[in-house]
Structure formats: structure tokens, C-alpha cells
Amino acid sequence: MNNGCYLVKKNKITKTKFFYATLYLILLIGIVFTLNNSFLYKKTIAKIIAIDETYIKDTEDGNYGCKTAIYEQNIKAIIKNTQYKDRVITIKNTYHKGEVYTQRYHKNDEVFVSLNITKDDIKKAHIEGYKRDKYIVILTSLFIIIITIIGKSKGLLSFISVIANIFLFNIVIYFNAKGISLILLSFVSALLSCTICLTLVSGFNKKTISAIISSCCGLTITMLISLIVIHISNYNGLRFDQMELLTRPYEGIFISEIIMGGLGAIMDIAITISSSLNEIIEKNNQITLKELITSGKNIGRDVTSTMINVLFFTYICGAIPNLVLYFKNGISISSLINEFISLEMARALIGGIGICITIIISIFITILLYKRSLNHE
């Protein structure tokens, strides 16, 4: 009997190892293929083999009065696809040191180029942008490898949930283009995302049900708070300058960002409290409701400050590229705070309130679901 169990267990381990070895081999093949997939593109791709860079002059920005240096690059690149494969071309590229509207290129960069052809001869070439697919594939492969090494099957399920979220996001974009409210689409997709992610990772059980209900309630309250803040303040104190080029209403995008940005933190809080209280009840079903509530509050206190900071940096990270560009081009800190930080702070504060409310809801829902499991006789 023991030998039979041992063989079954050994066979299961062997199958698991074979599965992960096959997965890693597929990822490796994918990386190698992406590094050599230029033949798949219709656009001309070239690899930079040499650069000669020259300083031209300093120029003054008329808007802010700051100076920036201008450089010219004489680039030699070898074409990697199309009928002109293996031809060496020369490209001139001018860029500003601030790199707001221009780009500096480096040796070994792969770029898309447009060619000016006259009588089957290349007269001139112009760089259109980077070829970035290899970086995406390498990062994705690295992410899958690390998440499966650390999380095993749950790590793989987490990655599947990420794919599901990307799919939901594309659905939101598609139906929003058809005229459906962005707020409604974001809210519904957030609820679906929450349900799918938690069920995939934690299975369908009481703690998952508790976390799903708590997350949905937390998201609903967060969305309502966002709507109330916008309508009461009448947009006073909220600067939407960074959204001025958008063709969609600012309100919908702002609230959708809060819903999507707060989803991860709210889910994390909900499953943390639900799992922790579940563990406490399983270890000691004699615990009183008062002690259980106190334990839930203590857990909430431990994670609240961390999650609010995570939420703040989640929102602020979207503005970092613009902040860096503006700093490099001499724009004052006060202007940056007015244009960017105030909006991100509003998002973080609303999200923080949502997190705090989710803690209370999670404790209440978990106790309600596990009430029968408590033995107070």
C-alpha cells in the first residue's frame, strides 16, 4: 500500500517537473525566435552598427526660457529584412538633450526605418522608432519563470489571471468605442476581474467568496465616493491638464483610473483579512466574536499603511515619465504639483478611503460566513 502511494506521488512529481521543463523550453525557443523574427515584418528593420555623434548648438525653449543642447548622430545600420537585406545604410538623426520630441539611439539598437528609393537605390533613410518586441518577450518569459518557481501552480494561475485581465481590458476599450459608458464598463470589468482572479488563485471556498464580496463592496463604495467628490467639488482643486488632448470626458477616465488602480489593493486587503481570519478560526474555533473582530482590526492596521502607499505610487507612476521630462526641461516644482500631483493625490486619497472601508467590510463578511464554524458551547 505504501509502495503504491509512493509510486503515485513520484509519478506526479515527475509529470510536474516535465511540464515546467517543457514550459521553460518553449519560452526559450520563443525568445530565440523573437530575436530573429525580422523576416516576419513588412516594415524595414535595421540594426545600428556604428554611431558618430556631434554637438551642434544650444537652443532656447521659447515657452519656459530654458536652454537645451542639440546633437546630430551619423548612424550606420545594416538592414535585416526585405529585398535590401544586408545593405549598410547611413542615417542622420538630430535630437535634443531633453529628448521630449526627439530620440537618441545607441549601438546595437534595432529600429524601424523608412527608405527613400530611387531607381532601386536607397537615397535616404529615416528612423521611425524602436523594434521593442524582443524586450516584451524576454520580460514576459522572465516573469513566467520567476512566478512559477516561487508560486508553482498558483503562480501559473496568477499569470493566467493576468491574461484574463488583459482580455477584459480590451473588451472595455472595444465597447467604449461603441459608445457605452466607460465608468460602467470599468466597474463591471473590475467585478469580473476580481471574481476570476480570486477564484483562480484561491479556489472556490468560503474565504474566496468572502474576499470577492468584500472587494465588490469596496469597489462600489470607492466609485460612489469618486462620483460624490467630483460633483461636490465641481472639479475645483483637480487639474486635468494632462488629459487636455483626450477626446473623451475627463470624469469617466478619472473614475475609471481610480477603479482600475484601486482594484489590486482592495483585492489584496480583502483576501489577506479573509485568509487570516479563516486560519484563526481553523486553529481555534472557540474564539469569541469580539476576539475575532479585534484580530481582524489588528491585521487591517498592519497592512493599511503599506497598501495606501502602494496605491499612491501606483497612481503617481503614470505621471513619472512626464515629471522627468518636465524636470529636465526646467519647469518649476510648483507647476508640476499643480498639474500632476494634485490629481494623483486625489486618486490616492479616494483609493485609501476605499481600502479602509474594505477592511471593515471584509471582517464583517468573513465573520458572517464563518459564524456557524465557531463553537461557543
Residue ranges, per PLM feature:
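Hydrophobic secretory-pathway targeting helix
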Residues: 1-45
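Membrane-interface helix termini and inter-helical loops of multi-pass transporters
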Residues: 92, 124-126, 234-244, 333-336
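Extended, hydrophilic extramembrane loops/domains of integral membrane proteins
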Residues: 97-133
